[in-house]
């Protein structure tokens, strides 16, 4: 399935960019306000973490530099552990049951820390342990375990997929975007992205697709951009539904695609933006707004 075909049926207001150069998709005022709101939301969810060290080993090549081994706590099986990978923040969370503070004091992690920006742990009152690993970029996890250890290999997206795409649903959380008659832009943006996700999820193409949000959250502007940069994305697509500056009802309507003017390659942002615009206006029978 071609990128243009996948996106054409769904996108109304989009920003299409070929990495690594991204355009300013919001005014600075909007960026700063939404970032302030997002940071406030993150602060409310903050967990007190303590620093965790890693027992470094000598590595022979770059692949081995992205490997870790975790010693299992006494009485805990590999199947008891819950692992999540937050691509937006590049954070891997490892949840371990029946874990005391002393477990973390004995260097349970062995491997290379070259690809790690931060490593910390926390223990709840119910003796449930949490390890948070903040990576230097987006990685896919290849995991396995035996009776004593859990093994992690960290693979770059391009080691797993032929092409990498980042899709951004605009606004979210306490930042509603454009509003009219009780309808928030953030909900429309997300609805379009979830429809697009359903198509990608059922595609036979080996395309890795990362989403800045799939719920009513509000990643910071920097997190949205860094997801694209740190996944070395081939395409960045941002979904927005605009309104008039006054917010009043208007006869102005249609589809518009923004792109990076600095990307002058023959098959660069402008070419992809034109493909999107042509297909979307045809599919939606909407007015071409450039």
Locate the predicted segments by residue.
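Active-site-proximal helix/loop segments of hydrolytic enzymes
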Residues: 94, 183, 187-290
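Short hydrophobic segments within beta-strands
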Residues: 168-170, 212
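Glycine-rich N-terminal loop/short-helix segment of MobA-like nucleotidyltransferase
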Residues: 171-181
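Short linear recognition/processing motifs and adjacent strand/loop elements at protein termini
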Residues: 1-166, 173-174, 192, 198, ...
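Generic anion/oxyanion-binding catalytic loop in active/binding sites
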Residues: 77, 178, 217
